[in-house]
């Protein structure tokens, strides 16, 4: 999630509960998801993956005899009575498994992953999940510099104010599994992003000193049916970094705003939206293709986004704004011209590529913004939504049960994950009759 307002979006799912460090007795059952690895020569081959909810979503309770209460709240270190030190946290906080992910708004069906923001009983799980490898003990590490990532999406139930996010985070492959974090990736530990949030546990360990959790973040997709946004966020540190004080702030070690790619921000208002008048019609499912284009030395130079719908390739839009280079890709010249100062200072596109080369974890979520109504994504210069239209109270009037479905996650060589369906040429009809 690419904005500080993500914090407000998450509080509804936390309900005062955060991840414990000692697994409990309730079984964890991960939904299975079929994904694909692609080459131009061999096509796309299926692979087995699993989905795990973020550790913050798992049920938590204090160990027996420690009284009622949780093990901490978002934005703060854990309470000292149960977490005076890391070792005590590991003993005193019990994290239970989740036997039925559907109760948290997460279901899979073959190649499809469905995330529900609101359940029929009114609960708001706002799930965030990660992609596990076939062992279920490690995250699937994506190395995408010089490659492309593609998925199909149904965004029809995402009105103004909603955000379906699919992005990459430079988390540890095991979720930083350790003596005091025995669950690791199996329980969804180790989250970080470029916002450097403070959470009671970082890498599964009690965050006694209240540090922030920072790492490189590549927002492949943050969107609803009215607006879309792509943004690389770089940090000048490798992997998960524990920040303190000013390091966690805007001028710190990570680029919080990113270099954003949104058609509305460059005066292209007919490219993406609900209806046939838009090139990408979000009233129907479509395919999202993101290419991470490298030079001959293997350094990331450009990020190229385009779509496929109804069998036709919809090429990326070109910028249409004075002072902005005429381009249809994210590249350093564009980022510098749009005021992405921190992005340029902290490593720019090459720095993002270095993280993509080291390997990043795929995260997927759905959320709303109780504080800012997601207006950074879809209002004003960013999109067509009216002021206040994205308030949660209005979202449920437009769509009582917001959800998103991601299907056919696939990645591989440039040009290997998508195809344009060529319509057959009409056969010549019979010649004129000569009666």
From Swiss-Prot:
EC primary class: hydrolase
Disulfide bonds: 38-44, 71-93, 83-89, 160-385, 192-215, 196-214, 235-254, 243-248, 259-335
Catalytic activity from the UniProt record: Endohydrolysis of (1->4)-beta-D-glucosidic linkages in cellulose, lichenin and cereal beta-D-glucans
Keywords associated with the record: Carbohydrate metabolism, Cellulose degradation, Disulfide bond, Glycoprotein, Glycosidase, Hydrolase, Polysaccharide degradation, Pyrrolidone carboxylic acid, Secreted, Signal
Gene Ontology BP annotations: cellulose catabolic process
E.C. designation(s): 3.2.1.4
Main location group: secreted
Function as written in the Swiss-Prot or TrEMBL entry: The biological conversion of cellulose to glucose generally requires three types of hydrolytic enzymes: (1) Endoglucanases which cut internal beta-1,4-glucosidic bonds; (2) Exocellobiohydrolases that cut the disaccharide cellobiose from the non-reducing end of the cellulose polymer chain; (3) Beta-1,4-glucosidases which hydrolyze the cellobiose and other short cello-oligosaccharides to glucose.
Membership in a protein family: Belongs to the glycosyl hydrolase 7 (cellulase C) family.
Name of the featured protein: Endoglucanase EG-1
Source organism (scientific name): Humicola insolens (Soft-rot fungus)
Gene name as annotated: EG-1
């Amino acid at each position: 999630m690419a904005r500080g307002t993500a914090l407000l979006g998450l509080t509804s799912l936390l309900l005062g509960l955060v991840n414990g460090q000692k697994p409990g007795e309730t079984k964890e059952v991960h939904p299975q998801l079929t994904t694909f690895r692609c080459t131009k020569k061999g096509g796309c081959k299926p692979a087995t993956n699993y989905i795990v909810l973020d550790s913050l979503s798992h049920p938590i309770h204090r160990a027996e005899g420690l009284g009622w209460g949780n093990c901490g709240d978002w934005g703060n270190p854990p309470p000292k009575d149960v977490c005076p030190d890391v070792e005590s946290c590991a003993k005193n906080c019990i994290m239970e498994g989740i036997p039925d992910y559907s109760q948290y708004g997460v279901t899979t069906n073959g190649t499809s992953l469905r995330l529900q923001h609101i359940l029929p009983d009114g609960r708001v799980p706002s799930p965030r999940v990660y992609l596990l490898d076939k062992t279920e003990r490690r995250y699937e590490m994506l190395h995408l510099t010089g490659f492309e990532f593609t998925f199909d999406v149904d965004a029809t139930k995402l009105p103004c104010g909603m955000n379906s996010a699919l992005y990459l985070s430079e988390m540890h492959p095991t979720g930083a599994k350790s003596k005091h974090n025995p669950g690791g990736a199996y329980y969804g530990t180790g989250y970080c992003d470029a916002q450097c949030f403070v959470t009671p546990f970082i890498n599964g360990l009690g965050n006694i000193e209240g540090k922030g959790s920072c790492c490189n973040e590549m927002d492949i997709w943050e969107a609803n049916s009215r607006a879309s946004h792509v943004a690389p966020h770089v940090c000048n540190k490798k992997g998960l970094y524990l920040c303190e004080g000013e390091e966690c702030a805007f001028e710190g070690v990570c680029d919080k705003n990113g270099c954003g790619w949104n058609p509305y921000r460059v005066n292209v208002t007919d490219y993406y939206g609900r209806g046939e008048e838009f090139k990408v019609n979000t009233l129907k499912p479509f395919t999202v293709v993101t290419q991470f284009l490298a030079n001959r030395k293997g350094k990331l130079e450009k990020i190229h986004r385009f779509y496929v719908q109804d069998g036709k390739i919809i090429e990326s839009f070109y910028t249409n704004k004075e002072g902005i280079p005429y381009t249809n890709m994210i590249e350093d010249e564009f980022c510098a011209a749009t005021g992405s100062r921190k992005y340029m200072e902290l490593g720019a596109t090459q720095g993002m590529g270095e993280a993509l080369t080291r390997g990043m974890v795929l995260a997927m979520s759905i959320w709303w913004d109780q504080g800012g109504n997601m207006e950074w994504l879809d209002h004003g210069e960013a999109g067509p939504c009216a002021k206040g239209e994205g308030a949660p109270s209005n979202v449920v009037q437009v769509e009582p049960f917001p959800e998103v479905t991601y299907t056919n996650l696939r990645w591989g060589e440039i040009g290997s994950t998508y195809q344009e369906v060529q319509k057959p040429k009409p056969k010549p009809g019979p010649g004129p009759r000569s009666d």
